[in-house]
Amino acid sequence: FMQPVGTVFYSDIELLQLVEKINVLHPYAFYIVDTLGSMYRNEVSHRFYLIDENMHPDILLGFHGHNNMQLAFSNAQVLGKIQTKRTLILDSSVYGMGRGAGNLPTELITQYINKKIQSRYDVTMVMDIYDEYIAAIRKEYEWGYTMPYHIAASHVCHPSYAAYLINKQTLTMKDIERIIQSIPEEYKVLYDRELIEQLYSQFQSKKIDDTASVREIEGLIQGRKILLLAPGKTLVSHGQTIRDFIERERPYVISVNFVDGGYPADAYFVSNHKRMDILGQENRPLKGTRILLTSNIPNPGWEDYLYVDYDRYTNTDPMISDNAGLMLLKLLQRCGALEVFLAGFDGFQEDQENYYSEELYFQVNTNDIEEKRGRIQKQLKEMSRTMKLYFLTPSLYQGEEAYV
């Protein structure tokens, strides 16, 4: 089998030159490979005819499609209708299982062939495979069409760029598209992690002098205990503990990237474009509450907000560089805080709902959960050397830090 990755990037001359070499090698099969899932019907059929006319008749011709733009099935139908003496191979997988946006679903193409070409496949056997094996795998691993993969394919970019930006969990779809559009042409096809990290940082970066804001925050927290609320499920399971603490200690309460009327907050810290959009769309009752915004967030036109420098409060670890909780703790360190109480900082877990509210849910890359959790825990341990951290609710981040 010979599969030229990214067939769409071959010119006609380059493809014909490759076919000449294939005729010499004489493999079992040669493929059209839609690596980015960006090829339309006319592009696939054009390459088919070009190869079919010039390749040795004994060599089979295959098609390997990806579903970034939901085109794998339609392209397979086009090839299935072409009149040719050559044997055609259509790669497929049950339920489209495959990396990222997935591949051509076996159940769709076999049913199509049975109905429109010739009845030759037992589709119920495919369904049995799904029931016995794929359904369980699907619960553990994500694949299939998503908007970011569509954006990557529409700009003819490697899907891993989209995957990286999705996993940041801080960007709107418009943000993701802007960053992907900024990828230089020569870097689009082959994934460059360092490049996308750099472009993401540049997109988020907006340096400002936040001295005045820091001084004002110093005044707000002076002489008061500080309680940070994150949107973990323990906000519900340990709600009474939190409310009792607030009533007893009268702390300065800061909510991290979410709003909940059930807990009276003195301030909201927002560092995330996606969370900002949610707050704006819901038209939350924010009057009388201070809004602490990082400088990467556009001016919302709200009253009573303070901007702080985004760059200053990120850290050097790219996996958790702009974790909101860590950023806020770094800000409070700069403001002179000596101890901070934490609630709802549960830590992500696989196969569990990690947020107390469905509207706060963002998909988590299960492959990174344990690694990310360990890195956050390491940062918290470093911070606890100069600022005491007390977990008011159970947390997977707990190490040597205290638990109240």
Enumerate the language-model features and the residues they cover.
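Catalytic cores and adjacent flexible loops of soluble metabolic enzymes
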Residues: 1-211
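Metal-ion/cofactor- or nucleotide/acyl-coenzyme-handling active-site neighborhoods
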Residues: 208-404
